[in-house]
A protein has these predicted regions:
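GST-like fold's C-terminal all-alpha helical module
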Residues: 2-130
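Long, positively charged, glycine-interspersed low-complexity recognition regions
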Residues: 117, 122-168
Length: 168
């Protein structure tokens, strides 16, 4: 999915509070491993580059802003669809709903202002989230909730919350 890196930017900044760094030794072993698949090796080097940059700079405000623009573009489309239908592909739950529920959950717990910007998406999300089957899948252990709260507080104090970095 073309938004994998973008959700990673949001999650690493707002959900994991600086956790998720790789040891330099482990990263070096991963970097030096060569497979017989050159395409896989290219993807691996992209991962290595991400973790090296993350170790030095964290997730930059510019990276978050670029990711938010991409998500807003997608949610603009979903908002229009959800004015006339219950789910993203129509009136029946689809794999698209399942995939976007996970993305939306990560953004929701990170402080994305769904209710203000995308009320139909917010209703769609909360309708799914209120169902036990969905809630059980994303209900994080207490330690992750505490880490997330720490990340939200520190980014808000530093004026680096999602709301502060949203595209104008």
């Amino acid at each position: 999915d073309d938004l994998h890196e973008d959700i990673r930017n949001i999650a690493y900044r707002y959900m994991f509070g600086g956790l998720g760094k790789k040891s330099s030794k482990g990263l070096e072993v991963f970097k030096n491993y060569k497979s017989s698949n050159s395409e896989l090796d290219k993807l691996k080097m992209k991962e290595v580059e991400f973790y090296e940059t993350y170790d030095k700079e964290g997730i930059t405000d510019d990276a978050v802003k670029q990711s938010l623009v991409k998500f807003c573009d997608r949610y603009d489309k979903f908002e229009g669809r959800l004015t006339n239908q219950k789910y993203l592909m129509g009136d029946k739950l689809s794999l698209l709903d399942l995939a976007w529920f996970i993305y939306s959950y990560r953004l929701y717990v990170s402080g994305f202002p769904f209710r203000k910007l995308y009320p139909h998406v917010s209703n769609w999300f909360h309708d799914l989230y209120s169902q036990n089957e969905f809630y059980k899948e994303v209900n994080d252990p207490l330690i992750l909730k505490l880490i997330r709260q720490y990340a939200k507080i520190t980014t808000a104090l530093n004026r680096r919350s999602i709301k502060a970095l949203m595209p104008k």
